[in-house]
């Protein structure tokens, strides 16, 4: 067997994809430098949220389901690696029209994913579309996103083969040579570079992507519902139009609601001058929570993510012999991050062989 040498890896962007890729590369014996324009982790990054839902079933897509099962498994393993509990297995419920439920359940059975049907009346504090039926995936739940990023950054900071370089803006990446140019004129070289800078990396990548901005609301349930919410599942397909999500509080987080109905295409990730109030009001009235007036609104936040301009989904692209890019994360970028990290480790291994 040929020994694999320790390769030099540069990761541009310290969001969840960047940090997990750095971690996996270090575990594989490679030397890693992580660059970010802000702090590590950066509270302004797209990944830096209180929580994100994770589920494995992709109805009608056996390969997609298989991949998410693998991602779910790796997330559980990472709790041990990082020495931090960040996964709440509370389940994920999705609302479906009655005529689609049988196909969803059959798809789950074929993939070996455990699901149960439920009557929305059993979850009275979630706003299901009229006539919808719930399907609950039991081996699913919530990732405490902020806790993940902090734990990964601590682990990387303590690893002898990893260098974290916050406040290092990258101005150019050569896809053929792997040369990375920093704002101050410094140039780094690597055997492999991953650009995972989210919306702020579009100029470095040069791939056609669409930038989206979505307003999210963080709420505190009324005292009389606090106990109910402590064991509530994450839920999707909510609201009158079936386009909303609710992620339950727990582990120091608030209740979060979001909806595609308040997602819009934008030209830049800077939203300091945008008034979130109209979007937040529209979200509050979307029917995600039947008795929303009883909840206390703690904060509204705008989140940005990119999608492939052609497919509308995620995109992991090889830009050249030495450079890969997570050009678009799609709507499930956090949950699927271990898959990207694993693919990059495979690419580094090929380079180092």
Provide a role label for each language-model segment.
Residues 23-27, 85-87, 199-321:
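Active-site substrate-recognition segment that forms the wall
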Residues 27-47:
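Glycine-rich FAD pyrophosphate-binding loop
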Residues 95-166, 172-174, 307-309:
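Flavin (FAD/FMN) cofactor-binding and adjacent substrate-gating region
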Residues 50-126, 131, 243-244:
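Dinucleotide-binding Rossmann-like beta1-alpha1 core, especially the glycine-rich loop
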Residues 323-337:
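Glycine-rich phosphate/pyrophosphate-binding beta-alpha loops
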Residues 171-187:
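Conserved beta-strand-loop-beta-strand element in the redox core of flavoprotein oxidoreductases
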Residues 10-12, 35, 187-200, 341:
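Short hydrophobic core segments
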Residues 8-34:
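N-terminal Rossmann-like FAD-binding beta1-loop-alpha1 element of flavoenzymes
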């Amino acid at each position: 067997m040929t020994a694999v040498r320790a390769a030099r890896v540069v990761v541009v962007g310290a969001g969840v994809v960047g940090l997990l890729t750095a971690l996996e590369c270090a575990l594989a014996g490679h030397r890693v430098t992580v660059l970010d324009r802000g702090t590590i982790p950066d509270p302004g990054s797209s990944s830096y949220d209180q929580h994100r839902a994770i589920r494995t079933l992709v109805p009608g897509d056996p390969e997609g389901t298989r991949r998410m099962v693998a991602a779910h498994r790796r997330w559980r393993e990472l709790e041990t690696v990082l020495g931090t509990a960040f996964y709440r297995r509370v389940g994920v419920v999705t609302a479906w029209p009655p005529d689609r439920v049988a196909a969803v359940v059959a798809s789950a059975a074929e993939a070996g994913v455990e699901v149960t049907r439920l009557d929305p009346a059993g979850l009275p504090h979630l706003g299901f579309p009229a006539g919808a039926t719930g399907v609950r995936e039991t081996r699913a739940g919530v990732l405490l996103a902020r806790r993940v990023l902090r734990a990964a950054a601590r682990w990387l900071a303590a690893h002898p083969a990893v260098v974290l370089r916050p406040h290092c803006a990258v101005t150019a990446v050569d896809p053929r040579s792997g040369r990375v140019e920093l704002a101050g004129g410094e140039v780094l070289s690597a055997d492999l570079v991953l650009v995972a800078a989210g919306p702020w990396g579009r100029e470095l990548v040069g791939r056609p992507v669409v930038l989206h901005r979505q307003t999210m609301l963080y709420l505190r349930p009324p005292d009389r519902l606090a106990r109910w919410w402590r064991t509530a599942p994450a839920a999707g397909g909510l609201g009158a139009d079936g386009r909303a999500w609710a992620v339950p509080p727990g582990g120091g987080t608030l209740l979060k609601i979001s909806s595609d109905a308040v997602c819009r295409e934008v030209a830049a990730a800077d939203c300091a001058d945008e008034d979130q109030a109209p979007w937040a009001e529209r979200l509050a009235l979307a029917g995600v929570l039947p008795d929303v007036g009883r909840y206390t609104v703690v904060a509204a936040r705008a989140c940005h993510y990119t999608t492939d301009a052609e497919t509308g989904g995620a995109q992991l692209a090889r830009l050249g012999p030495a450079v890969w890019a997570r050009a678009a994360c799609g709507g499930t970028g956090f949950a699927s991050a271990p898959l990207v990290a694993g693919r990059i480790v495979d690419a580094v291994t090929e380079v180092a062989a």
